[in-house]
Amino acid sequence: SFVINLTNEDMARATDWCGVRSGKDYNKFQEMHLTPQKAQKVAAPIILESPLSIECEVLEIKELGSHHMFIANVVNVQADERFIDPATDEFRLSDAKLIAYSHGHYYKLGEEIGKFGWSVRKNKKK
C-alpha cells in the first residue's frame, strides 16, 4: 500500500527536499518537520500537513527499465477540513493552493477556468 499526499505552496520546500533525498539516508518526516499520521485504510502513513491524502492498495507493479509503475486502487481519500466548503461539502481547490511538478519545475494550481459542461453548453437566446 501507499499514500499520495498532495502538497501545497506552504509545503513546496519540503516537497522538493523529500523528492531529492533518499529515505535510506534521512528521516524525511523529522528533517522537514512533517507529521506522520495513521491512514484510515492502508498501512502507509499520511502527512498531516497535506491538504489531500489519497490512500492506495497496489494491484500490480510494472518494471519499466529505469523505474517501476504502480497500478493501484484508491481505497480512501482524506481532505483537510480547512479546505472543505461547509455548504456544499466540496473540496475548495483554490483555497488549498496545491502545487504540481513537471519537467523540473513546480507550479501553483487552483484557478478556475470553467465549470463542468461549459464546452458544450448552448448560448441562451434572449
Functional labels for PLM-detected ranges:
Residues 1-126:
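Basic, polyanion-binding surface patches
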